């Protein structure tokens, strides 16, 4: 029984180490392909001013390693810099690559997705 438990534990831990998740330390080394879209939403859930939010729809589910566990994510909300906002027509609604520089766990009234991208480069 102990051997079975040990084998089970080792198989789970080896799976966790082989899963290629983006974490806070190496997020810049994991470029992600997808499409950036502008989506007008309410400032708060279901009420408030309507504002433009920027969502990056990933080509495939991507694993993010958070303090709450590993999450497979298909879209993230992005904060754009002033410079990126000036060039919004050049980076939206087409296939591009995003290099994440800083991110956080979202899902608050301000964030509409589980992961929020605070700073990123687009190519």
Describe each region flagged by the PLM.
Residues 3-14:
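Sec-dependent N-terminal signal peptides
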Residues 58-62, 82-84, 100-102:
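A mature extracytoplasmic/lumenal domain signature
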Residues 65-88:
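Beta-strand/loop nucleic-acid-binding surfaces
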Residues 89-110:
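Flexible glycine-rich surface loops and low-complexity tracts that mediate binding to linear polymers
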């Amino acid at each position: 029984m102990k051997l079975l438990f040990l084998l089970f534990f080792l198989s789970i831990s080896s799976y966790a180490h082989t899963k290629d998740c983006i974490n806070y330390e190496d997020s810049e080394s994991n470029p992600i392909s997808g499409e950036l879209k502008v989506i007008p939403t309410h400032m708060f859930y279901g009420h408030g001013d309507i504002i433009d939010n920027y969502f990056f729809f990933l080509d495939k589910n991507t694993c993010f390693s958070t303090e709450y566990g590993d999450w497979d994510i298909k879209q993230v909300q992005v904060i754009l810099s002033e410079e990126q906002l000036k060039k919004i027509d050049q980076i939206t609604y087409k296939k591009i690559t995003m290099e994440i520089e800083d991110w956080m766990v979202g899902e608050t009234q301000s964030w509409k997705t589980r992961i929020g991208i605070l700073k990123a480069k687009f190519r």
